[in-house]
A protein has these predicted regions:
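Substrate-recognition/cap regions that form aromatic- and gly/pro-loop-enriched pockets
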Residues: 351-352, 358-449
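Loop-rich catalytic cores of soluble enzymes, especially ATP-dependent carboxylate-amine ligases
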Residues: 158-170, 177, 186-350, 370, ...
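Secondary-structure capping and boundary motifs in well-ordered enzyme cores
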Residues: 53, 155, 159, 175-179, ...
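Extended, compositionally biased alpha-helical segments that mediate assembly or anchoring
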Residues: 456-563
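Histidine-centered divalent-metal-coordination microenvironment in nucleic-acid enzymes
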Residues: 60, 175-188, 357-364
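Terminal catalytic/cofactor-binding subdomain
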Residues: 2, 12, 16-168, 175-179, ...
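Short conserved micro-motifs at the rims of enzyme active sites and ligand-binding pockets
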Residues: 72-75, 111, 144-145, 195-196, ...
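A glycine-rich phosphate-binding loop feature that marks nucleotide/adenosyl-phosphate handling sites
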Residues: 137-139, 238-241, 401-411, 460-472
Length: 563
């Protein structure tokens, strides 16, 4: 696997060193004991098997030319079918690749598979193309230069493309070129029966698990702004990204717009946002209420979308004119998820089988890392999510729902401002002080995870170490990815495009170098063979689907919308 080392970034102009509100490391005398961690979460025990957290990673990346231009070519056939390859597909655009790992208990296995997908892909791209390693896109010429993803001639493939056409007509193509990382998380099956017993719950295990994942989601919403501060890596963008749109960004140079204290513009008004959804209150207190909220949005026509109409030849330009074409159009920092059966709608699967895992959607690509994420960040995410699951999580009401959204926006735009104030239950609270308090509480979750991930019976240190890295970012904002990027742009006189292209080339070389060095290893050959077989089989699977009798698409679409 690729080995990455942390190094201190150049100190940004707004680099801060907190005094009275500085967060403390949790590595030595300040580290919570195992007993105090159990007491903090009101647990009788934390079994060894409970630490077998299961995670998977989905990563999006644009295909670009060696000069940083968005690829205009179709999805490479050597990567298989975008419809049926479970590991390599496309998101909105033909040029926006999406890599999907399997779910693993071992972090190293998950990242190893992600690295293998990268290496397999890079050795099969044409025209010396590479992957853009930043969340904000490369310089864009215009909407016509962003090809919508194609999934073949079957009705299900046409539906996937039509959904993307709908997104294009509703929000524009440019917004959809933003890339991110989705982190899928679940607790091991062995955890739930014993935890249910500890909680004194006498209902069904399915309902208990579902309610506890909703419990996690509510806490995640309350504190997701902290992840945006710590891992946000989109403080600036090319001017082409906002061409013709209103914005409040400042000019950094001839080609770059930014905000001085911004962390993650991807999660702000320029990113995955929908004006139509701003007033939508989606409740996470109860699965039925959550499903009802989304179901209503998927069956309520929206006048602005009705006005889109049909194409010049009468062809549909979106799946329907409802507020949401389908479940995935609802923009959120986290989603309750369940693996679906063939032909099953996600909401129907959730209502039938309950929540199986959660999907974190608030993470930028880190352009300083070859994979956009590393083991240390993964350990912190596990710590954060375990804390969200075990800590108290009151039910959310409408006022808090919109307060949480406002807090997120403030951190997106001003997160590195040392004077930033947020709102907690209607009262102002300093962001730095609040973040220090949360990080302090996370020490208990780190202790639990380290207690079962040590070697030879010794207490581990990896989760506490990952937490301490984030504490350092709070105490010095120049250590955050956003602070590091702006400092490098300012110190070296680089535009966002120049910095992102430079970093993309560096990571491209690192990944290809690691691939060449691993050529003779059994693991590399096994990966190569596996991805090759999957790609070939996926093309055959798509051909088989397309050879089956198909309804005419209009009839298929009408039946799908009526379901």
């Amino acid at each position: 696997m690729i080995r990455t080392t942390s190094r201190k970034a150049p100190r940004c102009k707004d680099g801060i060193a907190l005094s009275s509100t500085s967060a403390k490391d949790v590595g030595s005398s300040d580290r919570p004991s195992f007993a105090s961690a159990l007491d903090f979460y009101k647990l009788a025990t934390f079994d060894l098997s409970w630490g077998g957290v299961v995670r998977g990673i989905e990563k999006e990346s644009l295909r670009v030319s060696p000069t940083g231009a968005l690829s205009q070519t179709g999805h490479p056939q050597a990567l298989g079918s975008t419809l049926t390859n479970p590991y390599i597909t496309t998101d909105f655009s033909e040029s926006l690749l999406e890599f999907i790992t399997q779910a693993y208990e071992r972090i190293e296995d998950c990242l190893s598979m992600l690295e293998g997908i990268h290496r397999f892909t890079l050795t099969r791209l044409d025209n010396q193309e590479m992957l853009w390693g930043s969340s904000m896109p490369c310089a864009l010429g215009g909407e016509d230069e962003i090809p919508i993803a194609l999934f073949g001639t079957s009705n299900v493939g046409k539906l996937k493309t039509l959904y993307r056409k709908g997104l294009s007509n509703r929000y524009g193509k440019i917004m959809q070129t933003i890339a991110g990382i989705h982190y899928n998380f679940s607790m091991p099956e062995s955890f739930w029966p014993q935890y249910q017993q500890q909680c004194g719950d006498t209902g069904t295990l399915q309902d208990f698990r579902t309610n506890k994942y909703l419990h996690l989601i509510r806490n995640f919403h309350r504190y997701s702004w902290l992840l945006v501060y710590l891992f946000g890596a989109s403080p600036a963008a090319c001017k082409s990204f906002v061409r013709g749109r209103e914005h409040s960004l400042q000019e950094l140079d001839e080609h770059t717009l930014y905000l001085p204290y911004a962390t993650c513009l991807r999660m702000g008004n320029l990113g995955y946002k929908s004006e139509a959804q701003k007033s939508l209150f989606v409740c996470y207190n109860d699965l039925n209420n959550y499903a009802e909220c989304l179901d209503k949005a998927m069956h309520t026509t929206y006048p602005e979308y009705e006005a889109i109409g049909r194409g010049v030849d009468g062809e549909p330009l979106q799946i329907n004119a409802n507020l949401l074409q389908l479940e995935n159009e609802f923009y959120s920092t986290i989603r309750p998820k369940r693996n679906v059966k063939s032909g099953q709608r996600p909401l129907a699967a959730l209502k039938e089988g309950g929540i199986e895992y959660i999907e974190v959607r608030a993470l930028d690509l880190n352009p300083y890392l070859p994979l956009g994420i590393d083991a240390e960040q993964t350990k912190f995410l596990d710590t954060f999510l375990v804390h969200c699951l075990l800590a108290p999580s009151p039910e959310c009401h409408q006022a808090e729902f919109f307060e949480v959204a406002e807090n997120l926006t403030r951190v997106v735009e001003q997160g590195r401002d040392p004077a930033l104030m947020l709102s907690e239950e209607g009262a102002p609270r300093a962001m730095r002080e609040w973040a220090a308090s949360i990080l302090g509480s996370l020490g208990h979750a780190a202790t639990l995870l380290d207690s079962i991930h040590g070697e030879q019976g010794l207490h581990g240190q990896a989760y506490a170490s990952a937490l301490n890295t984030q504490v350092a970012k709070l105490n010095d904002a120049s250590l955050t990815p956003s602070g590091r990027m702006l400092a490098q742009m300012q110190d070296e006189g680089l535009s966002f495009f120049q910095l992102a292209l430079t970093l993309a080339k560096q990571q491209h070389s690192v990944l290809l170098d690691s691939s060449e060095k691993a050529t003779d290893s059994q693991l590399s050959q096994r990966d190569e063979t596996m991805f090759e077989k999957v790609a070939t089989q996926s093309l055959a699977d798509q051909a088989a689907i397309e050879s089956e009798p198909q309804l005419d698409f209009e009839t298929f679409l009408a039946q799908w919308n009526a379901a």
